[in-house]
A protein has these predicted regions:
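Amphipathic alpha-helical effector-binding/dimerization core
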Residues: 1-52
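Sparse recognition of residues in long alpha-helices and their boundaries
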Residues: 22, 119-120, 146
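Generic alpha-helical structural context detector
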Residues: 35-39, 74, 135, 139
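Short loop->beta-strand "edge-of-pocket" segments that line small-molecule binding or catalytic clefts
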Residues: 38, 57-58
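Cysteine/selenocysteine-centered motifs that mediate thiol-based redox chemistry or coordinate metal-sulfur cofactors
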Residues: 48-49, 54, 124, 134-152
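Intrinsically disordered, low-complexity polar/acidic regions
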Residues: 58-59, 90
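Extended hydrophobic
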Residues: 64-136, 151-152
């Protein structure tokens, strides 16, 4: 069970060198977008996926215990966004928020990748900005010919 990177955008003067290639596959259990996708699956789908997954360690910080992943998914469901810090690559982390269709079904995620230090120190601001971007994209695909609607 993997997640694929479709597009990446890097500021021209970015001091960070981590740039995943488009179409890079990442394991669901170790990426913010992957965990967000799991959180939006039905309970039956979640159970099947988690119980049948080999939670392989990519770094010393990767979640490798199913109970720990379940707890993480519950927290993501509660807060509405996902964060991973150093689970794919030490020193690099990501924040992901959902993009929904008109019926409220998760269709995609949008994520921000940066140094774990930068993400930790700016988490609340970055989550808020990413959520605004996710809401705008959701509104554009759900209501393409209308003005923006605020999530409730």
């Amino acid at each position: 069970s993997d997640i694929y990177t479709l597009e990446t955008v890097v500021p021209p003067q970015s001091p960070y060198a981590y740039v995943p290639n488009s179409a890079t596959n990442l394991p669901l259990h170790a990426s913010a977008s992957g965990k967000l996708l799991i959180a939006h699956m039905s309970p039956k789908e979640q159970k099947k996926l988690i119980e049948n997954s080999d939670l392989q360690a990519l770094t010393q910080y990767t979640i490798t215990k199913k109970e720990e992943l379940w707890n993480c998914i519950k927290e993501i469901t509660r807060q509405g966004y996902a964060v991973e810090l150093s689970e794919l690559s030490v020193g690099i982390g990501s924040i992901a928020v959902p993009i929904f269709d008109l019926r409220g079904t998760l269709r995609a995620t949008i994520s921000l990748v940066g140094s774990t230090e930068m993400l930790r120190s700016n988490l609340n601001r970055m989550v808020a900005e990413l959520q605004r971007a996710g809401e705008r994209i959701t509104n554009k695909i759900s209501y393409p010919n209308t003005t923006l609607h605020k999530f409730q």
